[in-house]
Amino acid sequence: LVEECTVNWAIVRTIIVYGVVDNMSRSNLVLWAKSALQKGETINVINDQFRAPTLAEDLAEGCMLIADKKAKGIYNISGRDTYSILDLVYQIADFWQLNKSLIQVVSSTTLNQPAKRPPRTGFILDKAINQLGYKPKSFREGLNIIDKQLKGFEK
C-alpha cells in the first residue's frame, strides 16, 4: 500500500536503540546494565540472542539523511556489527570497569518475555550506506559518546 502512494515516503527499520536523553521515560540496554552493575546488583543476561545495537545519534542521522535527500523506500538504520546480548553487556562492563562477576548468564527461555524474539537480528546496511552516506559508529564509539553525555548531565 505504501509503495503505491504518490507522496514521498520512507520507512526506517532499526534495532535495539541505546543512548542518553534528559528525563528518559524508559532505559535501554546500555544504561540499564551500567546502572545495575555500578550499584553492585546481579543481572541476568541472555547468551542466545544477537542484535546490532543502534546509537540514538546514528538513528537520528539516518532519518536526517533520508529527509535531506528526499529518499524514498525502506531503509535499515542500525549499528554495523551484530553481537550477543551477553557480549554487549560484557563490553559495557569493560568500558566502565565494572564487576563482570555480577553478570549471570541465562538462556532466553528462562525469561518471561511478553513476545517471542528472533535469535538473531541484524541488517544489511548497504542501501543506507551507498544511497544516503550513512556511517554508523562502532559500539565502542557509541559508549564513548554516552560517557561524555553522562558526564555532561552530572554537571
Question: What is the predicted role of each segment?
Answer:
Residues 19, 45-50, 75-82, 131:
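Glycine-rich Rossmann NAD(P)(H)-binding loop
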Residues 57-65, 140, 144:
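Amphipathic alpha-helical segments that line or abut small-molecule/effector binding pockets
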Residues 62, 69-114, 154-155:
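Mid/C-terminal beta-alpha module of Rossmann-like enzyme folds, strongest
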Residues 84-90, 107-146, 150-154:
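Conserved C-terminal active-site "lid" loop/helix of NAD(P)H-dependent oxidoreductases
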